[in-house]
């Protein structure tokens, strides 16, 4: 990259302390841009400010609310709005990059509070939601303030079009592909091992589908084992497993980025049995880069990311028998599995930050044309109307 050095404000709507795809995307983008010489400040809800990186400014502590089949930790309201305005005022930014600006969050508050070049990235892929339609009259003029819009996938783009009747350029989430290509094979994790990473207590991550498929898989692949990593309480999950199969499971809990790279380089198959609510599937891109053969449910986001089956195998979503059938085929046919993994590893390079960040920066350049930077908006009627303070 040979770029003009910018002052960039990134807004992350979700709690910085909680693992998640959006948080990882914002963190990696911020650190990539900083390494390229740009000034970057991230505004996010933060619980433990002492552990946050120097480039992160806390907008306050998030609260947990149900959203899109999971629990999102967000921040909203007049106190947060004041902090957003202060951050914008202090930042003297050339450009703001707001993530998920269409949900009640500090990203939406920043869009209300600012004038000037603003890029919005839309991550969510969700069914039509009454809550978004209810505040549509407020959202639409705010979203129109965005100079440019990015969607991380066709699924996210479709959600944006359906909810707010606007469009976006598709630029995928980024990964550091080299980190996963350089993973080391851990002998005890290798062999006929199926890997799963995710919040396994969260139903939409689909671990119960894999658990239901395992007895079938074990009949045809007697040496199969399952390696599970991620946050959650494993006791209840273990109790739901057939006692005769429990010895085949190992629960690792949270793992580091290095351990994740080794995990993905070691397992024979990485399985993503998610049942919905996904817009991209960053873990699939990481698994491809790590050299695992990927087997995923055929939800739209995964089907698209895997090239409709060219770079990873697919099974019918929420169908344990189909999952078992495809997994058995891959476990018993090593040549087929290795060929699939090889295609996936080569394909994963398109998600590397060197590619993705270049595409994002090109959007920044477009948004900056004719601009003199970001300023505070003096027009807050939408905010006052939302709070029932019209005329105040």
Tell where the protein language model's regions lie, with residue ranges.
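A conserved mid-protein helix/loop that constitutes part of the nucleotide-sugar donor-binding site
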Residues: 24, 28, 201-216, 236, ...
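Short hydrophobic beta-strand element within catalytic cores of glycosyltransferases
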Residues: 269, 293-296
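Nucleotide-activated donor-binding/catalytic signature segment of Leloir-type glycosyltransferases, i.e.
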Residues: 237-261
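Conserved acidic donor-binding segment of nucleotide-sugar-dependent glycosyltransferases
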Residues: 308-309, 313-320, 329-335
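N-terminal strand-loop element at the rim of the active site
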Residues: 5-6, 12-19, 26-27, 31-79, ...
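Conserved donor-binding/catalytic core segment of Leloir-type glycosyltransferases
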Residues: 186-205, 211-215, 227
